[in-house]
Regions:
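Iron-associated oxidoreductase/ferritin-like identity signal
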Residues: 1-158
Length: 158
């Protein structure tokens, strides 16, 4: 099915963002694991896996619309050298993704592409949930201090 070029461009831009997030979150997860923060590392890896599912959905949709997926990581992952910095970077990125995907919904609506619009709307809900989690973590750090927060990240389990 031939798709609208502007929609395919939005899908590819989102794919680039998702691929960047996957690399960023997987690396941050391993950093947290290496620092001994298993719980936070596991949670970060879970976010990376969700972003992989987003990338898969975007690739499927682009191909369905007879487009060619751009599978290059076009953006540079921002890792952060400390846990709080990682959380702040990730919150900004998730907030940016929500804004980007809301703009994409408008493009899809103008093109009367409800399938792509629905995909973006679903991704928005996931990114909002991620942003809410990250905001809560930063709030916890502010309330209890970084040392107390990190001590809670030492154990495994979710």
């Amino acid at each position: 099915m031939r798709g609208d070029q502007k929609v395919i461009e939005q899908l590819n831009a989102a794919l680039s963002s998702e691929l960047t997030a996957i690399v960023q979150y997987m690396t941050q997860s391993e950093m947290c694991q290496n620092w001994g923060y298993k719980r936070l590392g596991d949670l970060t890896k879970g976010r990376a896996i969700e972003e992989m599912r987003h990338a898969e959905g975007l690739i499927e949709r682009i191909i369905f619309l007879d487009g060619i997926p751009n599978i290059e990581v076009g953006l540079k992952p921002q890792l952060g050298s400390k846990v709080q910095e990682q959380l702040e970077i990730d919150l900004k990125d998730e907030t940016d993704a929500v804004r980007q995907y809301n703009d994409a919904v408008k493009v899809c609506a103008e093109a009367k592409d409800d399938g792509s619009k629905s995909l973006f709307e679903s991704m928005i809900r996931d990114e909002e949930r991620h942003a809410d989690f990250l905001d809560a973590q930063l709030h916890a750090i502010k309330e209890m201090g970084i040392a107390n927060y990190l001590s809670q990240q030492l154990t495994g389990g979710k």
